[in-house]
Amino acid sequence: FNPTFPNHKNGDGSWDGVTNASQITNPLAWMEVKDKESVSRISTHAKLLLNFTPDLKMRLFGSYSYNMVENSQYLPTVVWAHGQAYRGVRKSESLVGNAMLTYRKRLKRHFIDALALAEVQEEKFSGFYTTVTNFSSDLFGFDNLQAGALRPWEGTNSYYERTRLLSFMGSANY
């Protein structure tokens, strides 16, 4: 970048530099970028022990996690030719349930040891984002995406994925 440009704005509020090209702006103009990120997280766990008899026991475990990340960014017209706004949300959820049943019995010279396990798991991922360019003013930023005139190719997308797993296991010893 041209080192002879001043380290402050001009009298009209603009930065010296090539303002009609993207990503060739005065590096100090990048301080005017509006960037916001919001993160929400919830994580819970529970465990329950049941003793039906001294020989028969059950353990139950469950957990739930939720994550959401919201991103918003506005590159003003002094940074990106005609400005650019981006908004996106990513969410994930995870649910796990686990059950374990044990039986241990001694009868004189005999010993029985049995185990039964079951687990269920589900995960969900979803999100969307959109990018808008060609703003006539920096007045709205990322708060009004309609103010931008163009949506670039592949500038908007959404997705959803859901996976599940169910498993069982058992063992017996004599």
Where would I find each of the regions flagged by the language model?
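Surface-exposed loop/interface segments of Gram-negative outer-membrane beta-barrel transport/assembly proteins
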Residues: F1-R41, R59-S167
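Residues on the lipid-exposed face of transmembrane beta-strands in outer-membrane beta-barrel proteins
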Residues: A46-L50, A99-Y103, G170-Y174
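Outer-membrane beta-barrel strand-turn architecture
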Residues: L50-P54, K105-K108
